[in-house]
Amino acid sequence: MVYSYTEKKRIRKDFGKRPQVLDIPYLLSIQLDSFQKFIEQDPEGQHGLEAAFRSVFPIKSYSGNSELQYVSYRLGEPVFDVKECQIRGVTFSAPLRVKLRLVIYEREAPEGTVKDIKEQEVYMGEIPLMTDNGTFVINGTERVIVSQLHRSPGVFFDSDKGKTHSSGKVLYNARIIPYRGSWLDFEFDPKDNLFVRIDRRRKLPATIILRALGYSTAQILDLFFDKIVYEINGNKLQMDLVPERLRGETASFDIEANGKVYIEKGRRITARHIRQLEKDSIERIEVPVEYIAGKVLSKDYIDESTGELIGAANMELSLDLLAKLSQSGHKRIETLFTNDLDHGAYMSETVRVDPSSDRLSALVEIYRMMRPGEPPTREAAETLFENLFFSEDRYDLSAVGRMKFNRSLLRDEIEGSGILSKDDIIEVMKKLIDIRNGKGEVDDIDHLGNRRIRSVGEMAENQFRVGLVRVERAVKERLSLGDLDTLMPQDMINAKPISAAVKEFFGSSQLSQFMDQNNPLSEITHKRRISALGPGGLTRERAGFEVRDVHPTHYGRVCPIETPEGPNIGLINSLSVYAQTNEYGFLETPYRRVRENVVTDEIHYLSAIEEGNFVIAQANTNLDEEGRFIDELVTCRNKGESSLFSRDQVEYMDVSTQQIVSVGASLIPFLEHDDANRALMGANMQRQAVPTLRADKPLVGTGMERAVAVDSGVTAVAKRGGTVQYVDASRIVIRVNDDEMYPGEAGIDIYNLTKYTRSNQNTCISQMPCVSLGEPVERGDVLADGPSTDLGELALGQNMRVAFMPWNGYNFEDSILVSERVVQEDRFTTIHIQELACVSRDTKLGPEEITADIPNVGEAALSKLDESGIVYIGAEVTGGDILVGKVTPKGETQLTPEEKLLRAIFGEKASDVKDSSLRVPNGVSGTIIDVQVFTRDGVEKDKRALEIEEMQLKQAKKDLTEELQILEAGLFGRIHAVLVSGGVEADKLDKLPRERWLELGLTDEDKQNQLEQLAEQYDELKHEFEKKLEAKRRKITQGDDLAPGVLKIVKVYLAVKRQIQPGDKMAGRHGNKGVISKINPIEDMPYDENGTPVDIVLNPLGVPSRMNIGQILETHLGMAAKGIGEKINAMLKQHEEVTKLREFIQRAYDLGDDLRQKVDLSTFSDEEVMRLAENLKKGMPIATPVFDGAKEKEIKELLQMGGIPTSGQITLYDGRTGEQFERQVTVGYMYMLKLNHLVDDKMHARSTGSYSLVTQQPLGGKAQFGGQRFGEMEVWALEAYGAAYTLQEMLTVKSDDVNGRTKMYKNIVDGNHQMEPGMPESFNVLLKEIRSLGINIELEEK
């Protein structure tokens, strides 16, 4: 395997055995590709904005004399970049401009004669843009649009499984779901009549819809039934015989022909009888006349001489009717063929209950059902029915819906019209009747072939279309009313409805969510999340167990492990690692093709529909070198079931062992040894890990860490290869390799790093360079680590030395005992950044003012504010400190004479304003790291705002100047090379000032041309610099666009450093979570024979019942990795020769059976080996991929190599007494995470505070500074103790006895410790409530 210079710094030893046939795909592609489809120009008009415009335009006026046509659209450039949008609190979006054409036709002239054409570009609102990382910045906050898993359009056949009717009879139904438009349901009732519902309204007999389509009763019967023909021959009756139709019936007479009795009366007709009849080619038999009674006519019979209707279609035959038919000359009589077995008379019965008789009455029935209370007219009824399913404006099955519809009805072609046809409706009814007759199966609605993904692009397109349709109505009216000669397209279009629809979707849709930004994994998982909730989806309350359950088709598409615990379980899922969506929006997963028993590297993506037809082997099937199956029988999946198949039957094979899990679950080592419930918790808790101060790569990983860190976008990744020319904390400059440069450019890439920025979850985002000056880098190398990444690998926690043993009850019930060393070394110290905002508004009484002159506040409280009343950067503040001084005007109040006197003496100011300053919340303390001031346009900026502005201008100029200097240096380097190669002496050239170089002329024409090109570039560079600087200056100095009524906003950023402490929640990656119970002195912790104390003591009882054995294996393997690291460290300390080091490290990499990873250290230089050794001395990182990890034998070998007992257990000594513990203890290294459930955020205490308005009881919760509820059960406890006075105090003065509270305060001040309880307010509330019900209750004194 070839490693780049950067990758050689630290190589993770991989225990994976299966070759990696397919690289991990880009993990955010589901978001980026979908949105790209939405905004890119699509000449076909199949999707995106183009499709939305084409579906609504052209808009014709009601008269048809004019129309507004769509020509094209373009998206402009966004005003602010992503960072500026986040700081200013605005949306990152681009203006949408649409070219429209207004065509006016001549009124009197023949159709299509154009009178006038006007074309104009119209502004149609702003479209939010996606950032490079798949998020949207809406009003300054990063949001993610979660993909939705919804029921695919098409036709579905289902049953109620016998739950609707008391008899337990199974009722079948069919539902046609369009992408847009009315739903059409067909359903059987318990009497086996077929009914139809439109949009889930009241049901009508299904034949109504057929009559509305223009079918008569006879035609309806002809569509759904086979016929039996009887011929009247004198007194005899003969029947055309189809032997197959007799199966299962009992003969009601002797069936004979040609004098031979085939079946005797009363006998059941079997397959043997049928074969006999077919063999003798019996096509006609004689039947008794009574046999025809009760049969149903299939068409109308008319007396030709009188024109009178004798027998109507669907009429039951009686012997009298038969005689009448015979007399009127009808000798051949057609009846419907029905039986109880597989040809039910359902449609015939339905026609009988149908109140309509012709097309008009059917249309009127449908109209009455859809628009109850409105008088129907023929036109209205026809228009309504036409618009329901046959109008392209109102109904659209979409390409997906048509494909699913045709597949379900077993048609050959999968394309067709978006609206329904007569045949479509009839075929659905026929299939439903077939299913009721026992032919065919109902669909499984939880099958992923019947559920599809709607991603950002598609949902945004739908919302945009909704906005356009609103505009369409207004345009139609304008075209009809206005004076068209003076109107322009601009006057027709109001962009508000479109902007509103788009804004509503991105801002407040259920699927537009505040991004989970705890760490890179939580970001990536949030973007790959798939929700069944949301508009057009399920609701939590209505979703049953089936929808939430894991389905066989989830394999390789949706993760069976990662889903939330609680009410959303199974409704919110995560995309599997390799899954992607196909053109129709169905999830597909890759497989390797198997040809003639050989597994090829040819990859096919199969959707759930296609997969069912194939036999697919698992990824861990044994193969020989040539890719042939070794075993005769192979475990495979087929039609959703797993079983053994012969190796010759296998058609596909899984791509990878981690194909079935999501990104989160694929990061859990030894996942295969964990119980699924705990794995679920482990996957979910990794997303809650807070980035620590110094990230520490996991010693035991799975090999997915690099992919997650790079794809999440938190690291800085090299766009092109080159050499590091400059590096500091905030910028990395790369001189690009010549072969990767574009013609005519400076060949310098500049990467500006993010420093100490606040994330959505208040954690800290900061990047640190991980390359040094002069290092070569290749495209895709990680240049700088972000939060929770270490040398380009995801690092959510810390490697801790753990021991599994009880310790004085401090690890009872999952508690965790932590050594003080962990706190001293800042292993789990995290930085949290809070944003506190102070808004100055224009009130009715006058503007609020931000000032340091605050009434009734002492000097000490103002010590950290500057003269503008805003806190200094760097100030250390604690709860209650003033950050921004603000005063609000007070209303005029009636003054007492004393107050008037005071006013007269001390001046006006102090009394007519009240203090409304921004203070630090209680319980928070930290350092101010940044202050931003936003001032409304037209409001004078205060001194602090001007200082900040000046500082920003200086910084911007400095950054741009440095950037220019770097680019200039690169450019002049190339100019120097051209001049020297053109014959100019280097010494003389170096003496000349650089600007003069461009004035030199060369004799070589090619070189001269090159020189001129470079000179042009230089001018362009300077021009570009001026332009950029001017744009920056304009952005910084201009006023801000603030909400109405807001004059000024001051944002203060407060950084809090939190060390780990008792009450914080920690967890491993295997669902093993707990709360810290005690931080123990280092000297009291258990230690080993070398005197090394352990960091964490865990309870061994947390393992067996939870069945997450993965944590034990991780501990052993971590110990082995650390042992090898220590051996390398010892060799480094003793300054061993590089050859010995190389040999030892090579042995470590080669350990294990047939590994896929081949590390050849002989290709590494001595310097590279030394650097690798330096990075390995704290432990050799190991990858054990999911379902393909290290075996027990390999772990033991590695332990042995690290000089650790193969049992993984060692003797420990008690730190307090020095005595040996009586048995050996499992000690090793486990990767522990600190979760975002910190005790500082939860700890809360209250003495007095705010009270509820109605009940006068203290409020609840930390946010309201509330009290602790003394509830019903607590009252019982005090009652049980007989503590009457304590109870009285709790229920009165400590709670809602208002007068008692005030008296109590007065008594305490007076030193009289008595209480006088009165009437609790909640009792008065109860009395009032009872009185409101009309029952008077009065309290009488005894």
UniProtKB/Swiss-Prot annotation:
Any one cellular-component term (Gene Ontology): DNA-directed RNA polymerase complex
Any Gene Ontology biological process: DNA-templated transcription
Molecular function as annotated in GO: DNA binding; DNA-directed RNA polymerase activity; ribonucleoside binding
Presence of keyword Transcription: yes
Matching InterPro entries: DNA-dir_RNA_pol_bsu_ext_1_sf, DNA-dir_RNA_pol_bsu_external_1, DNA-dir_RNA_pol_su2, DNA-dir_RNAP_su2_dom, DNA-dir_RNAP_su2_hyb_sf, RNA_pol_bsu_bac, RNA_pol_bsu_CS, RNA_pol_bsu_protrusion
Positions of disulphide bridges: none
Keywords, sorted A to Z: DNA-directed RNA polymerase, Nucleotidyltransferase, Transcription, Transferase
Domain of life of the native organism: Bacteria
Leading EC class: transferase
Membrane-spanning parts: none
Entry EC number(s): 2.7.7.6
Coiled-coil region(s): none
Catalytic reactions on record: RNA(n) + a ribonucleoside 5'-triphosphate = RNA(n+1) + diphosphate
Subunit structure: The RNAP catalytic core consists of 2 alpha, 1 beta, 1 beta' and 1 omega subunit. When a sigma factor is associated with the core the holoenzyme is formed, which can initiate transcription.
Task performed by this protein: DNA-dependent RNA polymerase catalyzes the transcription of DNA into RNA using the four ribonucleoside triphosphates as substrates.
Family: Belongs to the RNA polymerase beta chain family.
Protein name, per record: DNA-directed RNA polymerase subunit beta
Source organism per UniProt: Pectobacterium atrosepticum (strain SCRI 1043 / ATCC BAA-672) (Erwinia carotovora subsp. atroseptica)
